[in-house]
UniProtKB/Swiss-Prot annotation:
The chain crosses the membrane at residues 7-27, 369-389, 443-463, 488-508, 532-552. Its main location: membrane. GO terms for cellular component: plasma membrane. Interacts with the Sec translocase complex via SecD. Specifically interacts with transmembrane segments of nascent integral membrane proteins during membrane integration. This is Membrane protein insertase YidC. Pfam families: 60KD_IMP, YidC_periplas. Residues 36-73 are annotated as: Disordered. The keyword Cytoplasm does not apply. Required for the insertion and/or proper folding and/or complex formation of integral membrane proteins into the membrane. Involved in integration of membrane proteins that insert both dependently and independently of the Sec translocase complex, as well as at least some lipoproteins. Aids folding of multispanning membrane proteins. GO terms for molecular function: membrane insertase activity.
Length: 594
């Protein structure tokens, strides 16, 4: 029993992990189609409802009629004047009504691993079922007259297509003599710069506030789990990082962190995001809200404090709009290049940020070296093993020493019989004399749990893992192994029930776990022996729904652990009992005497 103490600790902790996984991932995933169907039905049934969009106190943003979702994407795009967008990473257009970013596709990403599948659509017009857009406007007063808002028709006054080398200029002059010139530029990835020059040609000073919002009319259909944040996100100056789920604003009032100077706001999905970086020198209020009138929609917005433009003078305000894939090096570069506070938190690195991000950096380095993220996972596992080698050496050395004193422990058990207190005291004295810490092997297991979670986060949340192939049938390391033993791995023409799907890599992982546990003899207690025997089987089925990259890591880590334990035990002069244990397991047991 003492020899297997550390394994039972590991098993108990792992079971907790896997139960949580089943609760937070597998069950929600089974309802994914139902949720998607309900959302689609809701979008189809919604009819146009006139009326202005509501606003929370202190956040009175211009609104307008809420359009129905009765148009196709092509119909909605075709009915308005637009400026085309064409970059190496993006294609789409800007709607001249409201200068709205509501047509954007990501050239470098497709919906599935099939290279002929459609590219990812990020933004779509409000008139479509998947309406999702970003816009920037102003709030004035009677003195300012009409200012740019959702219904403003801008004039294209410079350029004809937005590319990294050709910005475009939009202009609008109101009835009071205030001129707005908007210059929009874009880089070769996902960042737009929106620079507004506001000139006051009236005889009196005017004050106006800028606003910006990211609005979407639906929620993503990916399973909602606690290891991943999808919803509202931003950094509100001194109030720090804000992560607000969709359900929070559905059930409660809008979330308003408070007045901020510096920061950003937006909406994030697992791999994609849309954010606005307001003018950093002017204080602003951020709000995350849900509106249920007409078509339900979710909105992340800001409103700045008013700026005053003197007669005959002009001011310049710059907003940044990020719309695209959350590529780690791109996001990190934007944080530095534009001095955006904590912009790297746009990617959900989790609680173990200090481990997760360096681990990604390591894996990304090996990927660039070898060109395969699967290979990068294997090499990263070796590096982690080397880092933890001193702890593992101590763990296995402690286990070896425990085996050495096993005969003495058996003698003590016979000597003390049912005197458990006396036996415990005698064993503690034996540990002291032999310089053995019976809990020494537990710490390496506990310390490595954050590493496991960090690796899981890297594989699950970073877009670099999306559709990243390994070898053979693994074409997406972020998805479960697509094979299943139910149909003999594709030889039979049926799929079988989803809960019985068991791929090749989960089976390999189960075998390695079985061998690792057999490095030690089966415990004498019948209950523990049953747990010892069946745990690899349970883990095999539970890990069938894990991302393939994580299962490959676990199988490889088990293999390295078997080799490591064998080498250390040989160095300690302790017999490696793997083959003897396997032989005793599969050999015929003698029949009990009658």
């Amino acid at each position: 029993m003492e020899n297997n103490r550390n394994y039972f600790v590991a098993i108990a902790l792992s079971v907790l992990i896997l139960i949580a996984w089943q609760f937070f991932y597998v069950s929600p995933k089974m309802e994914k189609d139902r949720i998607a169907a309900e959302q689609a039905q809701q979008a189809q049934q919604t009819q146009q409802q006139p009326g202005a969009q509501p606003a929370a106190p202190g956040q009175a943003l211009p609104g307008g009629a809420i359009p129905s979702a009765g148009e196709s994407r092509d119909q909605a795009i075709g009915k308005s004047a637009r400026v085309a967008i064409d970059t190496p990473a993006l294609s789409g257009s800007i709607n001249l009504t409201g200068a709205r970013f509501d047509d954007l596709k990501l050239k470098g990403y497709r919906e599935t691993v099939d290279p002929k599948s459609p590219v990812i659509t990020l933004f779509s017009p409000a008139e479509t079922a998947d309406g999702y857009f970003t816009e920037i406007g102003y709030i004035g007063s009677d003195a300012t007259g009409s200012v740019p808002g959702p219904q403003t028709t801008w004039t294209l006054s410079g350029g004809d297509k937005l590319t990294p080398s050709t910005p475009v200029t939009l202009s609008y002059t109101n009835d009071k003599g205030i001129t707005f010139a908007r210059t929009i530029s874009v880089d070769d990835r996902y960042m737009f710069q929106v620079v507004d020059s506001i000139k006051n040609e009236t005889a009196a000073p005017v004050s106006l506030s800028s606003y910006g919002r990211v609005t979407r009319f639906n929620k993503p259909t990916t399973p909602s789990i606690y290891v991943l944040h999808e919803g509202f996100v931003g950094v509100a100056g001194e109030h720090g990082l804000q992560e607000v789920g969709y359900s929070k604003v559905e059930d409660d009032e809008p979330v308003e962190p408070g007045k901020s100077t510096g920061g950003w706001l937006g909406i994030t999905d697992k791999y994609w995001a849309a954010t606005i970086v307001p003018p950093q020198a002017t204080p602003f209020d951020i709000r995350f809200s849900h509106f249920a009138d007409g078509r339900p929609r979710y909105q992340s917005d800001y409103k700045s404090d008013a700026v005053t433009v003197a007669p005959g003078q002009s001011v310049e305000l710059k907003n940044l709009v990020f719309a695209g894939a959350k590529e780690v090096p791109v996001v990190d570069n934007y944080e530095v290049a534009y001095s955006i506070p904590n912009f790297d938190k746009l990617i959900d690195w989790g609680w173990f940020y200090f481990i997760t991000k360096p681990m990604f950096k390591m894996m990304d380095f090996f990927f660039r070296l070898f060109g395969n993220f699967g290979i990068a996972i294997l090499i990263t596992t070796i590096v982690v093993k080397l880092i933890f080698f001193p702890l593992a050496n101590k763990q296995y050395a402690s286990m070896a020493n425990m085996k050495k004193v096993q005969p003495k422990m058996e003698e003590l058990k016979k000597k003390f019989g049912d005197d458990r207190m006396g036996l415990q005291q005698a064993m503690m004295q034996l540990y002291k004399e032999e310089k053995i810490n019976p809990l020494a092997g537990c710490w390496p297991i506990l310390i490595q749990i954050p590493v496991f979670f960090a690796l899981y986060k890297v594989i699950y949340v970073t877009i670099e893992m999306r559709h990243a192939p390994f070898f053979g049938w693994i074409q997406d390391l972020s998805a479960p192994d697509p094979t299943t033993i139910i149909n003999l791995f594709g030889l039979l023409p049926f799929e079988g029930p989803a809960f019985l799907h068991l791929g090749i890599w989960p089976i390999i992982m189960g075998v390695t776990m079985f061998l690792q546990m057999r490095m030690n003899p089966t415990p004498p207690d019948p209950t523990q022996a049953m747990l010892f025997t069946w745990m690899p089987v349970v883990f095999t089925f539970m890990l069938a729904s894990f991302p393939a990259g994580l299962v490959i890591y676990w199988a490889w880590n088990n293999t390295l652990s078997i080799l490591q334990q064998g080498i250390i035990m040989k160095r300690q002069g302790v017999k490696v009992e793997l083959f003897d244990n396997l032989k005793s397991l599969f050999s015929k047991k003698p029949k009990p005497a009658e």
